[in-house]
Amino acid sequence: MRMKRKKNLDERIEASSDYLITMKNDSLDFQDAIKENHLLDFKEIFKKEQPVYLEIGCGKGQFGNTFASLNPDKNILCVERNRNVLIMAIDKARELKLDNIMFLCGTAEYLPSYIPNNSIEEIYLNFSCPFPKKSHE
């Protein structure tokens, strides 16, 4: 079942810069895009310098927000391509006043141009969709 587009989605996404990073090269050809470097500086992004964990395909953010709540001594970067569900995850993080979680809007294949080598402690893949419907046909 397809989720209904959230009301004022564009405005809400724009107002979420305190929790959101948007991939710049998501529209480029994958092979060209991974050659570009947009490496994230985790010391700049997160308020505290502590280990960074990565969740790919965070959806509505239940795992990421719970992880951040239970582990204040760890940072988590949650990746999601669907802005419609990502805004729900951001809203929940804001409601919980979490300062150790950030969200990256984009697809996983572009991550090598954003994540510095040897900077992630662990990667979590919780029910991420391996084949989006249109590209799998």
What are these model-derived regions, one by one?
Residues 74-77:
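Short beta-strand element of Class I
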Residues 86-88:
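Short alpha-helix immediately C-terminal to the canonical SAM-binding loop
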Residues 121-137:
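Mobile active-site "lid"/loop adjacent to the S-adenosyl-L-methionine
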